[in-house]
UniProtKB/Swiss-Prot annotation:
UniProt name for this protein: GMP reductase
Organism in which the protein naturally occurs: Shigella boydii serotype 18 (strain CDC 3083-94 / BS512)
Alphabetical list of Pfam families matching this protein: IMPDH (PF00478)
GO cellular component terms attached to this protein's record: cytosol; GMP reductase complex
PANTHER family registered for this protein in UniProt: GMP REDUCTASE (PTHR43170:SF5)
Residues that bind K(+): G181, G183
Binding positions (NADP(+)): 108-131, 216-239
Function (record text): Catalyzes the irreversible NADPH-dependent deamination of GMP to IMP. It functions in the conversion of nucleobase, nucleoside and nucleotide derivatives of G to A nucleotides, and in maintaining the intracellular balance of A and G nucleotides.
EC number in record: 1.7.1.7
Family to which this protein belongs: Belongs to the IMPDH/GMPR family. GuaC type 1 subfamily.
Transmembrane helix among keywords: no
Length: 347
């Protein structure tokens, strides 16, 4: 046993210090990034935000809607090959280039993903969907995936420390997913006591990944557009969003009605709801590590997407970053004990 004394921070613990700016308008900010990935050698350009690979967020409908904003969607792994074929037949090449194919790490998952990728060459992203990226099995699966799909861009995780981030990159991952426990419907931290404050995880993993030519995606912990800006400011190349994109028409959650008001169910992928739906229930040897919540219906996702992108542009103007790429080097975090004036929050 050992104790680390270093302070670790989450998004709620900091604000971004404003700096002089020559920008006249938020419209002057360029949010599009251009990347060439380490292993796949694929080039990509777009807004580096990803809808999470949850079946109440990462749907085909979400992918179609967010593609118009140049945003990626990690489509959840529970669609059948036949459903993928129907989606591909009805989607433009522009939509498909904004799609990540999610997979588990079993042999059956591998074969299914192979079939999906063979359906259309425009599917260039693979997202390896595992809660615990510290398992040797995950490292082996990443290496297997890299050998099988040398030109596909592979995202793998989840981890929160630099040494494991490096291990996944050296095994073949182009992008490492960073985050254990910060999600809005994740209960891993309270069920297991395991986790890491998200901002510190992003800062440390970005440093490790960038030293090897890899990239990271901050996965979880964002509740506002300001948190998205903090993740990018901390060094994230991509930011993955779940709860912020849940409850919309495109989110895919089941709609329930109470007292004449309609709600959409949103749950973590290790929750009892998810396991009942996909594997028949919670196995006797494990605990559910997610919760289910009822969200008021939020309408089309386009309004939320505009709000997130608008907040991100505004953050860039406050620090003088004309491009999202510049946000990290222009970010100075200050530690705080309050984020906002909450006097009217309950009205």
């Amino acid at each position: 046993m050992r104790i680390e004394e270093d302070l670790k921070l989450g998004f709620k613990d900091v604000l971004i210090r404003p700096k002089r700016s020559t920008l006249k308008s938020r419209s002057d900010v360029e949010l599009e990034r251009q990347f060439t990935f380490k292993h796949s050698d694929q080039s990509w350009s777009g807004v580096p935000i990803i809808a999470a690979n949850m079946d109440t967020v990462g749907t085909f409908s979400m992918a179609s809607a967010l593609a118009s904003f140049d945003i990626l969607t990690a489509v959840h792994k529970h669609y059948s090959v036949e459903e993928w074929q129907a989606f591909i037949n009805n989607s433009s090449a522009d939509v498909l280039k904004h799609v990540m194919v999610s997979t588990g790490t079993s042999d059956a998952d591998f074969e299914k993903t192979k079939q999906i990728l063979d359906l259309n060459p425009a599917l260039n992203f693979v997202c390896i969907d595992v809660a615990n990226g510290y398992s040797e099995h995950v490292v082996q699966f990443v290496a297997k995936a890299r050998e099988a799909w040398p030109t596909k861009t592979i995202c793998a995780g989840n981890v929160v420390t630099g040494e494991m981030c490096e291990e996944l990159i050296l095994s073949g991952a182009d992008i490492v997913k960073v985050g254990i426990g910060p999600g809005s419907v994740c209960t891993t931290r309270v069920k297991t006591g395991v986790g890491y404050p998200q901002l510190s995880a992003v800062i440390e993993c970005a440093d490790a990944a960038h030293g090897l030519g890899g990239m990271i995606v901050s996965d979880g912990g964002c509740t506002t557009p300001g948190d998205v800006a903090k993740a990018f400011g901390g060094g994230a190349d991509f930011v993955m969003l779940g709860g912020m994109l849940a409850g919309h028409e495109e989110s895919g959650g089941r709609i329930v009605e109470e007292n004449g008001e309609k709600f959409m169910l949103f749950y973590g992928m290790s929750s009892e709801s998810a396991m009942k739906r996909h594997v028949g229930g919670v196995a006797e040897y494990r605990a559910a590590e997610g919760k289910t919540v009822k969200l008021p219906l939020r309408g089309p996702v386009e309004n939320t997407a505009r709000d997130i992108l608008g907040g991100l542009r505004s953050a860039c103007t406050y620090v003088g970053a004309s491009r999202l790429k510049e946000l990290t080097k222009r970010t100075t975090f200050i530690r705080v004990q309050e984020q906002e004036n909450r006097i009217f929050n309950n009205l």
